[in-house]
Amino acid sequence: MKSPTPSRPQKMALIPACIFLCFAALSVQAEETSVTPQPPDILLGPLFNDVQNAKLFPDQKTFADAVPNSDPLMILADYRMQQNQSGFDLRHFVNVNFTLPKEGEKYVPPEGQSLREHIDGLWPVLTRSTENTEKWDSLLPLPEPYVVPGGRFREVYYWDSYFTMLGLAESGHWDKVADMVANFAHEIDTYGHIPNGNRSYYLSRSQPPFFALMVELLAQHEGDAALKQYLPQMQKEYAYWMDGVENLQAGQQEKRVVKLQDGTLLNRYWDDRDTPRPESWVEDIATAKSNPNRPATEIYRDLRSAAASGWDFSSRWMDNPQQLNTLRTTSIVPVDLNSLMFKMEKILARASKAAGDNAMANQYETLANARQKGIEKYLWNDQQGWYADYDLKSHKVRNQLTAAALFPLYVNAAAKDRASKMATATKTHLLQPGGLNTTSVKSGQQWDAPNGWAPLQWVATEGLQNYGQKEVAMDISWHFLTNVQHTYDREKKLVEKYDVSATGTGGGGGEYPLQDGFGWTNGVTLKMLDLICPKEQPCDNVPATRPLSESTTQPLKQKEAEPTP
């Protein structure tokens, strides 16, 4: 879907023409011949809609994950014959014709475990294996075992997995890291990209592209051999994100690619479908109905694209933070996504060089340099003094500060003077007693205040350290770890997100109850434990007092959340 072509730009960015040919060639490579599995809303048609609208299950994901016991076409035919008969019981029909997902056994950790021991004991509990799946299962098979987040998330998730893998590496489970990289490479080879998760209903979108960083992580253990082995899959994933770029005119967008008026190429989040999400069917229909001034398909696409961002949902995507139906994800150019694309280009350059292809390495370096200039030009708010998203409708950088602003520092794409300003903005506006706030807006959405998420804590910590801003980086780690430890001491679990306005409380908001487990929290906690404790005195719990070897700061008072961006 291309936007209307505006007036021609005065000056186009100069990028070698051979690179566009490279995109086209890689796009052809990424096209797969395998039949794409159909999601349950397509397989089951009106039956799926009726079951979800009947709200037979508290969680809409339950029926999306149910496995038909026979050919869905036969089940649908039976349903059409029986549904209008007197005494028809929809719940009984579902129970007869589907195998519902089993609730995972409640994990009861042994008494007296330290935080580190608890996490190390969870890795086998969270490991799954699905080499083979039922014919009509929404679960997609993967060749190697993998670690799931936990709770209702019974499948592997793309960007979650990177932070989980950091913890696996910290625990010495390099075999599991290698298995998960192999699985994601398999998905790229099979579907042309890494889906949101290994479910058929996730195939229409991806998530924040961390695959190249996963390969880079594996290369810490296996050397350049890992970079060379997975170079073809990294190239295919890059082609997926840049699909359609060779035909774009200035001022147009195509799927995940945006070409601005001066020819700058950036990316956005996008889902190929514009229908309600099967796993949140009723909620999406209600959101679309609540705003009759917008086409429902437009709202569905933006809801799905927000899910692709990993930030589902946040005031970041919304015109009115209190109204989800005002989100417009596809008209926003995200600072975190483009930072990850920059990092992907840099790793592709490194891998190409390792493979002996210096010409291709130079092309990826050219792309990375062009994107870095685009980030500095379009994704920096000079008036506010922080990185932010770019608005395709207003043609301006947005004003809202979010934790995504730390991504340019995380991938070493930021100018040094801007990194210093980001440290100040982070400490002033986002740092709380229990860690880093996602935004400073209280919207009731889970990717807003007062919630803090493990991956964003790690991105901020690493990013600030990259630019010598160690004091703020250590503040973030210490405050978040204290929160994790206090919650663990009380509840004996690690959770998906935390309330950072204080310590010892799990986060709230969103479409489902708080989940425990939890893959990425486990991974980030292990990394941070090793960061704050001296190497000669590693710690298994968060120390009662902050280690003296690091800078100390005064306790933070809770900052007031802002009502609007």
Curated annotation (Swiss-Prot):
Gene3D superfamilies: 1.50.10.10. The keyword Hydrolase applies. Substrate binds at residues 152, 159-160, 196, 205-207, 277-279, 310, 511. It comes from the Bacteria. Disulfide bonds: none annotated. GO terms for molecular function: alpha,alpha-trehalase activity. Keywords: Glycosidase, Hydrolase, Periplasm, Signal. It is an enzyme of class 3 (hydrolase). Residues 539-565 are annotated as: Disordered. Residues 1-30 form the signal peptide. InterPro entries: 6-hairpin_glycosidase_sf (IPR008928), 6hp_glycosidase-like_sf (IPR012341), Glyco_hydro_37 (IPR001661), Glyco_hydro_37_CS (IPR018232), Trehalase_periplasmic (IPR023720). It is found in: Periplasm. The active site is at 312 (proton donor/acceptor), 496 (proton donor/acceptor). It catalyses: alpha,alpha-trehalose + H2O = alpha-D-glucose + beta-D-glucose. One of its GO terms (cellular component) is periplasmic space. GO terms for biological process: cellular hyperosmotic response; trehalose catabolic process. The keyword Metal-binding does not apply. Its EC number is 3.2.1.28. Monomer. Belongs to the glycosyl hydrolase 37 family. NCBIfam families: PRK13270.1 (NF009773), PRK13271.1 (NF009774). Provides the cells with the ability to utilize trehalose at high osmolarity by splitting it into glucose molecules that can subsequently be taken up by the phosphotransferase-mediated uptake system. This is Periplasmic trehalase.
